[in-house]
């Protein structure tokens, strides 16, 4: 028996030697694993001709699992606040260690030879990527400069509008002269000084006295109705019984029971028992309170107590005929 070997793709131990890599299950697992890695490799290959440079975000720290090397590889290449998309993955795919591990992986797992070139990056392609990365950095710097210029222009525009507002407020304005009735130009500074001096000096103007409020003015007086004391009803301050301690008249008149009586409870209990029985049973609608006569049962002859059966039968027929004849005569 061949020694036990562990397959990392199938995640199981086998004892068939090299024959396991040719099995259908192993080839299916190998194909699925390569297809999971292939979209990331294809996206990295597209970045060779046109490298993209973006501002760094925490999502750029994402890693992917290299199936050939058996290790994690960073997808993007970050430096400072800049990130080159798929720079880390392309650098790993172009390394000689990855090429050596890929050849070993393909030989051990007997993968398709046509797919091996998709997971390798030649030094020429990586050099082309470096050139496109330089162009991407230049274009990113141009975009950043353009954005900075636009922001600076917007800031200058806001600052200019603010200065215009301040200038329009501080401009000298014409203040009308109340003595001559004509308008004479005065400066804002002079007017401010005049207002300040007038505030400092005590005013000589005689202000009219404030009107004194007469609270005892004559007018329609209020009518005193008197103390509204209900006779016979006390107050808690006078030592009377609180309202919630006084018994109601209905309670005093008759001490009535709360809830149904015991007989009603038994009737209701019996009804609840009958509800559980099938509604289509025999005698479900029978009124037990109705009175029935003694002869309500159907008569099939006399009860056979003693003697012969035919004697009781003949006696019953004779009595029935006599009763029938008697009833017929009564009706006529």
UniProtKB/Swiss-Prot annotation:
Keyword Coiled coil set for record: yes
Modification note: Acetylated. Acetylation oscillates throughout the cell cycle, and the acetylation state at Lys-31 is regulated by the deacetylase SIRT1 and the acetyltransferase NAT10. Deacetylated CENATAC is responsible for its centrosome targeting, and acetylated CENATAC promotes SASS6 degradation by enhancing the binding affinity of SASS6 for APC/C E3 ubiquitin-protein ligase complex/FZR1.
Effect of residue 31 to Q: Increases interaction with SASS6
Residues the record lists as N6-acetyllysine modifications: 31
Annotated organism of origin: Homo sapiens (Human)
Domain of life: Eukaryota
GO cellular component annotations of the record: centrosome; cytoplasm
Quaternary organization: Interacts with SASS6; the interaction increases with CENATAC acetylation.
Region of interest: Disordered: 169-213
Protein name stated in the entry: Centrosomal AT-AC splicing factor
Purpose of the protein: Component of the minor spliceosome that promotes splicing of a specific, rare minor intron subtype. Negative regulator of centrosome duplication. Constrains centriole number by modulating the degradation of the centrosome-duplication-associated protein SASS6 in an acetylation-dependent manner. SIRT1 deacetylates CENATAC in G1 phase, allowing for SASS6 accumulation on the centrosome and subsequent procentriole assembly.
Compartments in which it is found: Cytoplasm, Cytoskeleton, Microtubule organizing center, Centrosome
Region described as Required for centrosome location: 1-169
Biased composition (Polar residues): 190-204
Keywords, alphabetical: Acetylation, Coiled coil, Cytoplasm, Cytoskeleton, mRNA processing, mRNA splicing
GO biological process: chromosome separation; mRNA splicing, via spliceosome; negative regulation of centrosome duplication; regulation of protein catabolic process
Coiled coil regions in record: 137-168
Disease connection: Mosaic variegated aneuploidy syndrome 4: A form of mosaic variegated aneuploidy syndrome, a severe disorder characterized by mosaic aneuploidies, predominantly trisomies and monosomies, involving multiple different chromosomes and tissues. Affected individuals typically present with severe intrauterine growth retardation and microcephaly. Eye anomalies, mild dysmorphism, variable developmental delay, and a broad spectrum of additional congenital abnormalities and medical conditions may also occur.
């Amino acid at each position: 028996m061949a020694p036990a070997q562990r397959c990392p793709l199938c995640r199981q131990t086998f004892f068939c030697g090299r024959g396991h890599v040719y099995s259908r299950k192993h080839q299916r697992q190998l194909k699925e694993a390569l297809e999971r890695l292939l979209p990331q490799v294809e996206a990295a290959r597209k970045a060779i001709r046109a490298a993209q440079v973006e501002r760094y975000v925490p999502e750029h720290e994402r890693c992917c699992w290299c199936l050939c090397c058996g290790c994690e590889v960073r997808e993007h290449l970050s430096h400072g606040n800049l990130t080159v998309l798929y720079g880390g993955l392309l650098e790993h795919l172009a390394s000689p260690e990855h090429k050596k591990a890929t050849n070993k992986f393909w030989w051990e797992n007997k993968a398709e030879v046509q797919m091996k070139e998709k997971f390798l990056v030649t030094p020429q392609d990586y050099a082309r990527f470096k050139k496109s990365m330089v162009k991407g950095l230049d274009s990113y710097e141009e975009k950043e400069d353009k954005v900075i210029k636009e922001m600076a222009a917007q800031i200058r525009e806001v600052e200019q509008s603010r200065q215009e507002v301040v200038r329009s407020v501080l401009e000298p304005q014409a203040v009308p002269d109340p003595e001559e009735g004509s308008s004479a130009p005065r400066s804002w500074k002079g007017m401010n000084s005049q207002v300040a001096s007038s505030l400092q000096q005590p005013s000589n103007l005689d202000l009219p006295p404030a009107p004194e409020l007469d609270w005892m003015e004559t007018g329609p007086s209020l009518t005193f109705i008197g103390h509204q004391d209900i006779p016979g009803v006390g107050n808690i301050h006078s030592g009377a019984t609180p309202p919630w301690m006084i018994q109601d008249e209905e309670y005093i008149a008759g001490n009535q029971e709360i809830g149904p009586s015991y007989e009603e409870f038994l009737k209701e209990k019996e009804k609840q028992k009958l509800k559980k029985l099938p509604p289509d049973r025999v005698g479900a609608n029978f009124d037990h309170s109705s009175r029935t006569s003694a002869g309500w049962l159907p008569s099939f002859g006399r009860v056979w107590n003693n003697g012969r059966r035919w004697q009781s039968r003949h006696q019953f027929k004779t009595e029935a005929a006599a009763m029938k004849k008697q009833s017929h005569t009564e009706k006529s």
